[in-house]
Amino acid sequence: MKRPIVVINPNSNQSITDGLGECLARFNNNKSHPIECVTLKNGPFGIESQLDSDSVILPLANFVKTRPDAGAFVIACYSDPGIDTCRSVTSQPVFGIQESGVLTALCRAERFGVIAIADASVERHRRYMSRMQVLNRLAGEIALNITVDESANGSDTFSRLIEVGNRLKEMGSGVILLGCAGMARHRGKLQSELGIPVIDPTQAAVSMAVGALLPN
């Protein structure tokens, strides 16, 4: 029986979900646990504030409860909204992309940097990393100050990613973590430009989900 890894985009922007599907396509050679990317239709167009993040907690938990067929869930928003609540309503593993991305970055370099979408996101991310007890490994976090939609579709987003990535390198980052699921399609090109590892947190979370579902 196929038990999909369900990747949930908790905002209602379908283009973000489509971009996630493109970036995760290589994982679909796992026939037992295919990747299924879904959009939370009643979510905000972009999760850019604490209020946006809090507003999707119950809709996410309710969606998770409707999918007992899933092998695992990935919450594809860098704020990891509702991760504790979702874990409380299912026996399947639930992975948040910030938690997974940070843990992956720590395996690649002594210090990591994060590219956020907006200044308002940075404090929210730092609270979460404080909970994870990893702030001593954070070289810095710098915002692009764009919207979630622009992170995937903006005409000058890639040039801003290069600029901010180089600033984080100067601050001592040995690896860069993309702080928004919408940036996923830029990972490979950005890594080539910067010359250091660039982590897409959704790919990191799906990798962990695949590992969790390996047969004994």
What label would you give each PLM region?
Residues 3-30:
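N-terminal beta1-alpha1 ligand-phosphate binding loop
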Residues 7-8, 71-77, 173-180:
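Periplasmic-binding protein-like
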Residues 8-10, 38, 115:
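Short hydrophobic segments within beta-strands
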Residues 37-61, 149-154:
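N-terminal beta-loop-helix "entrance" segment that forms/cooperates
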Residues 54-69, 159-172:
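Short, well-structured alpha-helical segments in soluble
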Residues 87-108, 190-209:
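Short, acidic/small-residue loops that bind anionic groups at enzyme active sites
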Residues 96-132:
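Conserved beta-alpha
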Residues 120-180:
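Active-site rim beta-loop-alpha module in soluble metabolic enzymes
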